[in-house]
């Protein structure tokens, strides 16, 4: 016999069974192929397709954006659907070749930026012989030629190792073919223009600025190269040897120092000073001969020594006159005192710092013979 509790449980169990059956039936039902969303207007629903189902033909803009971001290592971005053409703007990667941006090692790029190691301009192909011809050819460049050089693309920006640029041919042993570069031929062994030919072993046409080692100024008077004969082993070419030969004709000895004025800080004798020194030496030599009873060798030697300024260290002021030097062994000089003999021997080699001459008797530790 059933009680009231069992009567209440049976209906509740039936309700639960029905609910479970209804939910299982709803889960097995197929869903529609769209998404139900309310329209912005308010009523009804629309079915919108998923983004995955879109094709390239339905949305071409999406395909173009996809092509622009096809980067990577060795990637090739294509600008056409056929995928046989390369995109020249975004062709990046390792080993890529692009005409506008071909930078890197061993790249061959446009003419505007030919940088790198051992690069060669495109404008110089087949023009190696023109450099040698222009180096030997005309010295002046016409305005049209300068314009042609400036119009060339790579000649102004051809930098690197082994580059050849015509307007700026600097360095060691460079040869500038253009006439504008003749004034600035600097370096070692350069041969430049006449006014600024500096360096070692230069041969300058400018007579006022012929500096260097072993320079020989051109003989053209005192106003050009006579007052500035600097260097080692200079030859003063502006001395009138005829006048000197007439002055020393009676002694038959020629002043050899006038041909080779060596040393630093040489001073050329002016005509007025030359005459004054010559007169002074004649007076001093006569007084000296009366006191010491010596030959004319010393007076002639002192005259030659005073005509120019033999400054320097260990200078050989004048050469021996063998005919007069032999008089030392003659019978006339048997009674010469040791002091006079040492003075006679010391005169040909009067060396030291600060030579003494009749007008300028200065030096360090010098002994004046007068």
Curated annotation (Swiss-Prot):
Residues 29-58, 273-298 are annotated as: Disordered. It is found in: Secreted. GO terms for biological process: neuropeptide signaling pathway. Residues 28-65, 121-151, 236-251, 268-345, 368-370 form a propeptide. Brain, subesophageal ganglion and corpus allatum. GO terms for molecular function: neuropeptide hormone activity. It comes from the Eukaryota. The modification Leucine amide is found at residues 73, 94, 105, 117, 161, 172, 188, 200, 213, 232, 264, 353. It holds the Pfam family Allatostatin. The keyword Signal applies. Residues 1-27 form the signal peptide. The modification Isoleucine amide is found at residue 364. Keywords: Amidation, Cleavage on pair of basic residues, Neuropeptide, Secreted, Signal. One of its GO terms (cellular component) is extracellular region. Neuropeptide inhibitors of juvenile hormone synthesis and gut muscle contraction. Belongs to the allatostatin family. This is Allatostatins. It comes from Diploptera punctata.
């Amino acid at each position: 016999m059933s009680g009231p509790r069992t009567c209440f449980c049976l209906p509740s169990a039936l309700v639960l069974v029905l609910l479970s059956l209804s939910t299982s039936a709803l889960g097995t039902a197929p869903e529609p192929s769209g998404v139900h969303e309310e329209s912005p207007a308010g009523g009804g629903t629309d079915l919108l397709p998923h983004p995955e189902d879109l094709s390239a033909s339905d949305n071409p803009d999406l395909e173009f954006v996809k092509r622009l971001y096809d980067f990577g290592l060795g990637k090739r971005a294509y600008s056409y659907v056929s995928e046989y053409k390369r995109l020249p703007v975004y062709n990046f990667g390792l080993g890529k070749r692009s005409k506008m941006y071909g930078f890197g090692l061993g790249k061959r790029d446009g003419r505007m930026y030919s940088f790198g190691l051992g690069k060669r301009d495109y404008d110089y192909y087949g023009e190696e012989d023109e450099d040698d011809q222009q180096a030997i050819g005309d010295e002046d460049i016409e305005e049209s030629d300068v314009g042609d050089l400036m119009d060339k693309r790579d000649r102004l920006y051809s930098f690197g190792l082994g580059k050849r640029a015509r307007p700026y041919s600097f360095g060691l042993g460079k040869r500038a073919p253009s006439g504008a570069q003749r004034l600035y031929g600097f370096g070692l062994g350069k041969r430049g223009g006449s006014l600024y030919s500096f360096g070692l072993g230069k041969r300058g046409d400018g007579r006022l600025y012929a500096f260097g080692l072993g320079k020989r100024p051109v003989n053209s008077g005192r106003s050009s190269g006579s007052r500035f004969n600097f260097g080692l082993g200079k030859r003063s070419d502006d001395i009138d040897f005829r006048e000197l030969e007439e002055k020393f004709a009676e002694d038959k000895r020629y002043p050899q120092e006038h041909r080779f004025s060596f040393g630093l800080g040489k001073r050329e004798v002016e005509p007025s000073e030359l005459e004054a020194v010559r007169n002074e030496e004649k007076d001093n030599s006569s007084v000296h001969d009366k006191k010491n009873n010596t030959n004319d060798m010393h007076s002639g030697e002192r005259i030659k020594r005073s005509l120019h300024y033999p400054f320097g260290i260990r200078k050989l002021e004048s050469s021996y006159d063998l005919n007069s030097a032999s008089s030392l062994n003659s019978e006339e000089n048997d009674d010469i005192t040791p002091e006079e003999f040492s003075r006679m021997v010391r005169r040909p080699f009067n060396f030291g710092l600060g030579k003494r001459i009749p007008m300028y008797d200065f030096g360090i530790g010098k002994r004046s013979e007068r």
